[in-house]
């Protein structure tokens, strides 16, 4: 069995403690009240029907988003859907008090400014606070302008499942540097990477995706931690 297969089988894995990779103290400074009444948000809300059904049950919802440059539109899903973010936000006339985790799949150097401009326009059309949208990307370096404009921002922890063991150190070093050099509000990742995130990003506000069968067992431990801001759960 590959070493990584052994590492990834459990949700709470022991981190690889590289002695010369030390998290900076300033990571613990990015804390504060983000106005979340509940830490439990709903995962995979990629249809207006699902949002409408659960609107009164949760304070926050995760939506997968792809920006289409040709149509200057945010499409919901992973690229093949026709539902737009405007369609999603039209399900209720009043979105105040609700938060949306936007997992934007294609932010890059070339389109970051256009995506920011269109997101600002979207919040205006739908009468939403920019601080109620969490823009998520593995490219923390492209999120600073979003943060400066009033959006909440989140750096996605890299997936390690298919990374060769000899390359894990390099991947984690790069992740730490990206976080240190950015102004993002959170770091997020699958709960299976809990120990890695806890060890390398101590004190950083965290968001977790907890979509496995063990959710009920893991939630009580994670939710009571002061550095846990949000846990995404699947619909029961």
Name the predicted role of every residue range.
Residues 1-236:
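Phosphate-group recognition and catalysis centered on beta-loop-alpha active-site segments
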């Amino acid at each position: 069995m590959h070493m990584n297969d052994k590492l990834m089988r459990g949700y709470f894995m022991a981190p690889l403690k590289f002695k010369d990779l030390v998290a900076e103290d300033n990571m613990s400074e990015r804390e504060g009240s983000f106005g979340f009444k509940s830490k439990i948000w709903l995962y995979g809300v990629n249809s207006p029907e699902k949002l409408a059904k659960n609107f009164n049950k949760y304070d926050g919802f995760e939506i997968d988003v792809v920006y289409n440059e040709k149509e200057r539109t945010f499409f919901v899903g992973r690229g093949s859907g026709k539902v737009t973010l405007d369609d999603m936000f039209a399900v209720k006339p009043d979105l105040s008090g609700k938060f949306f985790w936007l997992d934007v799949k294609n932010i890059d150097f070339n389109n970051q400014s256009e995506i920011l401009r269109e997101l600002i326009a979207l919040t205006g059309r739908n009468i939403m606070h920019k601080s109620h949208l969490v823009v998520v990307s593995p490219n923390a370096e492209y999120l600073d302008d979003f943060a400066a404009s009033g959006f909440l921002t989140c750096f996605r922890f890299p997936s390690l499942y298919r990374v060769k063991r000899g390359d894990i150190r390099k991947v984690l070093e790069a992740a730490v540097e990206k976080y240190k050099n950015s102004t993002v509000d959170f770091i997020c990742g699958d709960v299976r990477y809990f120990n890695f995130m806890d060890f390398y990003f101590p004190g950083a506000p965290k968001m977790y995706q907890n979509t496995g069968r063990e959710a009920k067992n893991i939630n009580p431990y994670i939710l009571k931690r002061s550095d846990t801001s949000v846990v995404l759960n699947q619909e029961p």
